[in-house]
C-alpha cells in the first residue's frame, strides 16, 4: 500500500511518520507541497511541525498550496487521509473536517503525555481499537484547542475521534482532540500517534493508527 507523507517548509515529523509507516508494512513516500497529482497513492498522512512557520495561524498558508487541491481529489476518490497535529490544523483550515484548532486556553506551548478515549472506530485509523478504549499518546502544540459553533452536530454525526480522558490540557470544547469528516475517511488528530508507536518511546498505542490504514485496504 502506497502512502504519501506530505512535506511543507517547516514540517518536522515527516521522517518519524515515514519510519512508522514502514514498520507497519506500508510503502511510504514523501510528497512535496507543490505536487498537483497524487492519484498513484492509496492514502495520505499530513504530519506535524510548523508549516510555513505557523505565520498568520497554524496551517493557514499550507492550506492554500497545490498539494492540498490534490488531497481534496483523493478525498473525492474515497481514499483515507490522516492529519496529525499541524496536519490536523491544515485539514480544519481547508474545511475537510469540522471545527477549528485554535490557541490553547493558556497561551503556552503544551507538550506532555495524555490519556485519550477513542470515541469512534469507524475510521480507517481507529478501526483496530474498541469504542471508548483509553489509550496514551503525547501532544505538542500551541494551537490545539478544539472549537465548533454547533458541537452537538459533531457528536450526533459520530465525528468525534479522540477525547481527552481526565485532564483537558488545552481547554478543548468537550475535551475533543480528534475529529473526522462525515465519511470517516478524513481524520484529524492533535496527539502524535507516531510518537507512541514503539516500546522504547513509552507506548505503542499509536501504532494501531498506521496498521489500521493497511487493514482498511485489506
UniProtKB/Swiss-Prot annotation:
GO terms for cellular component: cytoplasm. The active site is at 85 (nucleophile), 192, 194. It is found in: Cytoplasm. GO terms for molecular function: ATP binding; glutaminase activity; phosphoribosylformylglycinamidine synthase activity. GO terms for biological process: 'de novo' IMP biosynthetic process. InterPro entries: Class_I_gatase-like, PRibForGlyAmidine_synth_PurQ. The keyword Cell membrane does not apply. Pathway: Purine metabolism; IMP biosynthesis via de novo pathway; 5-amino-1-(5-phospho-D-ribosyl)imidazole from N(2)-formyl-N(1)-(5-phospho-D-ribosyl)glycinamide: step 1/2. It catalyses: N(2)-formyl-N(1)-(5-phospho-beta-D-ribosyl)glycinamide + L-glutamine + ATP + H2O = 2-formamido-N(1)-(5-O-phospho-beta-D-ribosyl)acetamidine + L-glutamate + ADP + phosphate + H(+); L-glutamine + H2O = L-glutamate + NH4(+). Its EC number is 6.3.5.3, 3.5.1.2. Keywords: ATP-binding, Cytoplasm, Glutamine amidotransferase, Hydrolase, Ligase, Nucleotide-binding, Purine biosynthesis. SMART domains: GATase_5. Residues 2-218 form the Glutamine amidotransferase type-1 domain. Part of the FGAM synthase complex composed of 1 PurL, 1 PurQ and 2 PurS subunits. HAMAP family: PurQ. Part of the phosphoribosylformylglycinamidine synthase complex involved in the purines biosynthetic pathway. Catalyzes the ATP-dependent conversion of formylglycinamide ribonucleotide (FGAR) and glutamine to yield formylglycinamidine ribonucleotide (FGAM) and glutamate. The FGAM synthase complex is composed of three subunits. PurQ produces an ammonia molecule by converting glutamine to glutamate. PurL transfers the ammonia molecule to FGAR to form FGAM in an ATP-dependent manner. This is Phosphoribosylformylglycinamidine synthase subunit PurQ. It comes from Methanothermobacter thermautotrophicus (strain ATCC 29096 / DSM 1053 / JCM 10044 / NBRC 100330 / Delta H) (Methanobacterium thermoautotrophicum). The lineage of its organism: Archaea, Methanobacteriati, Methanobacteriota, Methanomada group, Methanobacteria.
